[in-house]
Amino acid sequence: MPHIDNSRVAAMNKLDRYDLNILAELQRDARISNQELAERIGLSPSPCSRRVKQLEDDGYILRQVALLDRKKLGLTLTAYVHIGMDRHTPERFEHFESVINQCPEVLECSLVTGMDADYQLKVVVPDMDHYQKFLLGQLTRIEGVSSVRSSFVLNQVISSTQLPLQHLRS
């Protein structure tokens, strides 16, 4: 018998079409006014506001942020960095994660499987000189790092922060 993910079932049962439409609209533009949001999803402003507050309280909406233009800020080099660890112990992973969490150049850090690496990082820096300083001055100095392989982005074809919600619609 297949395993049923109860958290997914609970989420599907809890979120109705208004909630899903609110989430979709807020993913497109979190600065939308409550009045405009209510009009777009077909509710009056007061219930719309209550639903947004409930979605925040329930943890569906984690926070609202501004998306910055990295190129205008001089951050023109993006690298995906694959990190191999010398030992696969909880202590080694915890140490790496605590150190890498302090690196502002690292936008994402994922523990991965299926490749010759333990972690994949997304790193954004101004240029190759800054990347070299980050690599040699910080990354390779982290205790336990045994290998580093970098791939550089030539052209970002898709960049989105919007999560797909279709699987939750009935």
Where is each model-derived feature located?
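A compositional/biophysical signature of low hydrophobicity enriched in polar/charged and small residues
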Residues: 1-170
